[in-house]
């Protein structure tokens, strides 16, 4: 029997002629970066599809987590899961915080909320769960624990584009949700990611962080990225 690769996932590709038409428009406009017309169209269509008003698209899902941590000004220990892609953990470390692992529920593979409080210390600043394989975390329990202990919540929703929980987008929970548009994800742009927040002030800060920290007047007011 000949060896045949079995792929976990494969990207869905648009017809080449459609991509070529979009590329032609980019060449004609000469706008290659920094929130061009196609980025704005993409953000609007994703927001409309998810019934959300705030989206900040970025280069990938990893930088989305970086920006979420930076936007919330987190310092100290972040409760997270050991069952995730390395980018979740490396983002915490790159932002100068310390990951503290809480074990998972063997049935859902998500963080077990009943084990969070035993890991809290005076240095804990946030909880960063992952919706593993698009299966929603126990968001109500996690958000309640965070509120009780005055912690922030970032959900890594890299697998969860389009997921609803009790009639609401899963991106509506926590302070910020991040996602990925990597080629292996449900919605792919080859590379890409986004941050979502219902908090308008956080949304504006995330927009500044995405563009080098510039505000609308082009004054640098935050330590941004690109």
Regions from the PLM with identified roles:
Residues 44, 66, 140-143, 191:
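Active-site phosphate/pyrophosphate- and oxyanion-stabilizing loops and adjacent acidic/basic residues
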Residues 60, 104, 132, 183, ...:
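Short, conserved catalytic or interaction motifs in soluble domains
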């Amino acid at each position: 029997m000949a060896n045949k690769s079995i792929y976990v996932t494969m990207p869905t590709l648009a017809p080449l002629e459609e991509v070529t038409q979009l590329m032609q428009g980019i060449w004609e406009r000469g706008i290659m970066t920094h929130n061009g017309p196609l980025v704005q169209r993409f953000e609007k269509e994703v927001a409309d599809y998810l019934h959300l008003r705030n989206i900040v698209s970025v280069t990938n899902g990893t930088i989305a987590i970086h920006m979420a941590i930076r936007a919330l000004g987190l310092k100290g220990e972040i409760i997270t899961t050991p069952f995730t892609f390395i980018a979740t953990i490396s983002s915490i470390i790159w932002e100068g915080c310390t990951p503290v692992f809480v074990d998972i529920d063997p049935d859902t593979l998500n963080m077990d909320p009943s084990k969070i409080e035993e890991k809290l210390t005076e240095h804990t600043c946030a909880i960063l769960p992952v919706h593993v394989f698009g299966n929603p975390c126990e968001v109500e329990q996690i958000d309640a624990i965070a509120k009780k202990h005055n912690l922030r919540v970032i959900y890594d929703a890299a697998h969860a584009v389009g997921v609803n929980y009790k009639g609401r987008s899963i991106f509506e929970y926590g302070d910020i949700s991040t996602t990925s548009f990597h080629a292996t994800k449900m919605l792919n742009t080859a590379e890409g990611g986004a941050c979502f927040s219902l908090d308008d002030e956080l949304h504006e800060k995330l927009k500044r962080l995405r563009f080098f920290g510039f505000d609308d007047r082009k004054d640098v007011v935050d330590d941004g990225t690109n």
